Amino acid sequence: MEKKAVIITGGSSGMGKAMAKKQAELGWHVMVTGRNHEALEETKKEIQTFEGQVACFQMDVRSDSAASDMIKEAVKAFGRLDALINNAAGNFICPAEKLTPNGWKAVIEIVLNGTFFCSQAAARHWIDQKQQGVILNMAATYAWGAGAGVVHSAAAKAGVLSLTRTLAVEWGSKYGIRTNAIAPGPIERTGGAEKLFESEKAMARTMNSVPLGRLGTPEEIAALAAFLLSDEASYINGDCITMDGGQWLNPYPF
């Protein structure tokens, strides 16, 4: 049986790396992409379980041409493409009144534009091949709630959520392409956690906001992602699954 193949953008660290590792353990071919070539190669060495299983592609998701090249390279490496995980992201804490135009544009371009460019490139391939693929996007609970200090990311993630639902309807009905999203809460060993926990006060606030009283792990996100990519989830489309320990039920976003 031919092994399935997935592309994971931002796949060399945090949740992206965990998802890449999980799919590799399940026997999938995996392409990890990002801007740091050395980090990509290191990830490849760590997660590969057989020769030729993992490929690296250095790119910037803000480029639509790079997104197209990414798809071509994955198909060249594996002979097929079955799924795309749009994990590349950019974020930083900044009061809205102090946010610069460049800071705003950078996050919007990476998170929203990048997600669309990569999704479009993958869908064009599947449509041409008359294949039913799967897209998984990374959202955030503040996409429908609120998050002081992350207006740029909140706006971008809200766009990703709307994009997810719209493409699920449009491409799902026309081509059988499934599109879903995951909205993670505070996850340990990620860039987001490092930014949030710059002080003990910030850490305490976050921990108190999660009913389960702990952070999530990249491995838990990876397990959910693996399910959503699997045939067992073939009737899930246009949904956003929250994995935040119940934090969204509390009054504080982080």
Swiss-Prot record:
Q: Which GO terms describe its molecular function?
A: 2,4-dienoyl-CoA reductase (NADPH) activity; oxidoreductase activity, acting on the CH-CH group of donors, NAD or NADP as acceptor
Q: In which pathway does it act?
A: Lipid metabolism; fatty acid beta-oxidation
Instruction: Kindly provide the name given to this protein in its UniProt entry.
Output: Probable 2,4-dienoyl-CoA reductase [(2E)-enoyl-CoA-producing]
What does this chain do? Answer: Auxiliary enzyme of beta-oxidation. It participates in the metabolism of unsaturated fatty enoyl-CoA esters having double bonds in both even- and odd-numbered positions. Catalyzes the NADP-dependent reduction of 2,4-dienoyl-CoA to yield trans-3-enoyl-CoA.
Q: Which reaction does it catalyse?
A: a 4,5-saturated-(2E)-enoyl-CoA + NADP(+) = a (2E,4E)-dienoyl-CoA + NADPH + H(+); a (2E,4Z)-dienoyl-CoA + NADPH + H(+) = a 4,5-saturated-(2E)-enoyl-CoA + NADP(+)
Q: Which UniProt keywords apply?
A: Fatty acid metabolism, Lipid degradation, Lipid metabolism, NAD, NADP, Oxidoreductase
- Name the Enzyme Commission number(s) assigned to this protein: 1.3.1.34
- List residues binding NADP(+): 6-38
The entry's family comment says:
Belongs to the short-chain dehydrogenases/reductases (SDR) family. 2,4-dienoyl-CoA reductase subfamily.
UniProt induction comment:
Repressed by FadR in the absence of LCFAs (fatty acids of 14-20 carbon atoms). When LCFAs are present in the medium, they are converted to long-chain acyl-CoAs, which antagonize FadR as to its binding to fadR boxes on target DNA and thus derepress transcription.
Residues that hold substrate according to the record: 100
Q: Where are the catalytic residues? A: 142 (proton acceptor)
Q: Which Pfam families match?
A: adh_short_C2 (PF13561)
Residues engaged in binding NAD(+): 157
The record's Gene Ontology biological-process terms are: fatty acid beta-oxidation; fatty acid metabolic process
Q: What is the enzyme's class at the highest EC level? A: oxidoreductase
